Amino acid sequence: MPGLVERKEAHGETTLVVDPARLVEACTHLRDEEGFNFLADIAATDYLGWGRCGVAGYIGTTAGRDLNLPGSQGLAKLPEPKPKRFAMNYHLLAIPPRQAPPPPDAGARVFSGMVVRAVPPDSPPRGTPGRETTRRVRVQVWLDDGEPISSVVPVWPTADWHEREAWDLMGIRAEGHPNLSRILMEDDWEGHHLRKDYPIGGEPVRFSG
């Protein structure tokens, strides 16, 4: 596959790590040559503070919260460092074409306008070899802070809103997107509030009984 860096198998799932510079080429190959005709979701993850890099002022606290101490945040050991700060995960489906039912035959019975047929004894059950089922794969790219990624809207139009969400919440820019604007927050909102370095402030509220 074009741009393939690594193939990972875990928990029955396949992840294809791809060179960001060849993302569109890889996605086009998966659509045209491997049958992955539907993009279900794009999930962006911020790994700031993951591994052995200290983060000062993590999520806006005064002194910062060190995620690198063993046992912190429920971690029994230090996690392995990630290749870059952000991961973009593209969840793809290969949905087989729907086949038209065969015409009624002499052995079929009709109930309330519906044709009912007995399943042939040699028909393979759903989910077994011999019967085409939906396949899944995850395409993953790693990005540094501020590093853009090419839009895959020309490959799968469903990427439109997903890429806008990644921009709105994480600040990941999809170059070539037809309308890369905020999708959840106001247009004049400052920053991208699902980033781990986004300052979470607050105003004291006085309650009276």
Predicted regions and their residues:
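Terminal low-complexity/charged segments
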Residues: 1-209
